[in-house]
């Protein structure tokens, strides 16, 4: 009984993670500039991958009955590197003066850079 519940939760996590990853891919294709695309890749793809791996982790607990530590390390690795990579992509694009889309109203980074002493 508990095995069926755990596997059902794992299946739901895998499906939700797949849908979020698909939405991230659509966002990367449809959004206007590099800043919005990196935001879609950094947020949605990270969450989607974490849900997928969490679902696989629960599946192994429910089906095989053991805890796979490599999946926990993978979840932590994605949790750390996903947002960091998107931040560095956006920062390098800003430093290269990559133009934003016409829908961008104001630039908050410019005000922050004036107050920063580098």
Curated annotation (Swiss-Prot):
Keywords linked to the UniProt accession: Antiport, Cell membrane, Hydrogen ion transport, Ion transport, Membrane, Sodium, Sodium transport, Transmembrane, Transmembrane helix, Transport
Localization (cell): Cell membrane
A single GO cellular-component term on record: plasma membrane
Molecular function (Gene Ontology), one example: sodium:proton antiporter activity
Disulfide-linked positions: none
Ranges annotated as spanning the membrane: 9-29, 41-61, 70-90
Pfam families: PhaG_MnhG_YufB
Main location: membrane
Signal peptide extent: none
Membrane topology summary: Multi-pass membrane protein
Family to which the UniProt record says this protein belongs: Belongs to the CPA3 antiporters (TC 2.A.63) subunit G family.
Quaternary data: May form a heterooligomeric complex that consists of seven subunits: mnhA1, mnhB1, mnhC1, mnhD1, mnhE1, mnhF1 and mnhG1.
Protein function: Mnh complex is a Na(+)/H(+) antiporter involved in Na(+) excretion.
Name of the protein in question: Na(+)/H(+) antiporter subunit G1
Source organism of this protein record: Staphylococcus saprophyticus subsp. saprophyticus (strain ATCC 15305 / DSM 20229 / NCIMB 8711 / NCTC 7292 / S-41)
Gene: mnhG1
